[in-house]
Design a protein with these regions (language model features):
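Outer-membrane beta-barrel proteins
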Residues: 29-37, 151, 156-163, 195
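Extracellular/periplasmic, surface-exposed regions of secreted and cell-surface proteins
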Residues: 1-94, 240-244
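Conserved small-residue
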Residues: 49-160, 225
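Transmembrane beta-strands of outer-membrane beta-barrel proteins
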Residues: 55-57, 170, 176, 181-183
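Flexible, solvent-exposed coil segments and beta strand-coil junctions
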Residues: 16-26, 146-153, 227-238
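Extracytoplasmic gating/loop element in the C-terminal half of outer-membrane beta-barrel translocons
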Residues: 137, 188-244
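Extended hydrophobic-aromatic, low-complexity segments
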Residues: 10-15, 181-184, 192-195
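C-terminal extracellular loops and terminal segments
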Residues: 32, 77, 81-91, 96-99, ...
């Protein structure tokens, strides 16, 4: 069977959105938020038997699109979430986007040389000369998304979504006389994940065991870094203090 659906939810209970000028008191929860979901579901069932054997298969495929319609009178109001004690908030919910999309910096490769560092100094760093710039060669280079020639908080953007492009499920049962075997498979395709574990395994911020990725896939001076996905090994590196789409 094939089904299409549309659902709009109104007056969701959310924290009131207002200017920081109103103070730091707790925000009251009010019935104000609206969102809509559209999607399509596909179901296929097959049953048959032969002699002492019988089998039953059920396949389910689902695709949906979630969109926030309103969380405040102001179109640019946002709700933040998924925070970590390292990099702060991870997700942003705002009008025109899905709930809790990942929000941070886009990684645009690595600083390959001193000139690149001087042309676009790293986020939060005061690089005055070539000597200062040397310390940042081989580290992540964030994208200047607003095109103003410098890296700052305004360069954060939507970098991924936890919502899958496709949800698939398969139930399978095979029976022989009084014996039966049942299996269930579930999969999501196209959704992004925030991997907090990599803070510990792929970077130097914490002591402890590290992944082999640090050894094999880190940027190395003078090497072929076409397959590198992690920055040069440096325990003073601050790139992981910011939420990004780094591998």
């Amino acid at each position: 069977g094939l089904e299409w659906y549309y659902k709009k939810t109104t007056d969701m209970l959310i924290a009131a959105q207002y200017s920081a000028l109103a103070g730091e008191s707790s925000k009251p929860y009010i019935n104000f938020g609206d969102m809509k979901n559209t999607g399509v579901d596909f179901n296929f069932n097959y049953r048959d038997s032969k002699g002492d054997w019988s089998w039953d298969f059920s396949l389910n495929l689902s695709h949906y699109k979630n969109e926030v319609v309103k969380i405040s009178e102001a179109d640019d109001a946002s709700m933040w979430g998924g925070g970590t004690r390292i990099s702060g908030n991870v997700t942003r919910t705002t009008k025109g986007h899905a709930i809790s999309e990942f929000y941070g910096y886009k990684v645009n490769g690595f600083y390959e040389n001193v000139d690149e560092v001087l042309a676009l100094p790293p986020l939060g760093q005061d690089v005055k000369n070539a000597e200062d710039a040397k310390a940042w060669v081989g580290k992540f280079k964030f994208a200047d998304t607003d095109g103003n020639g410098k890296l700052d908080g305004n360069d954060r953007t939507f970098i991924g979504s936890p919502h899958p492009d496709l949800i698939a499920g398969l139930n399978a049962t095979v029976t022989w006389k009084n014996w039966d075997l049942t299996a269930f498979f579930y999969s999501t395709i196209g959704n992004d994940l925030f991997n907090n574990t990599k803070y510990f395994t792929d970077f130097w911020l914490f002591e402890g065991n590290k992944s082999s990725r640090m050894r094999d896939l880190s940027w190395k001076p003078g090497a072929d870094n076409s397959k590198a996905v992690l920055p040069v090994l440096d325990y003073l590196d601050t790139c992981l203090l910011y939420t990004s789409d780094a591998a």
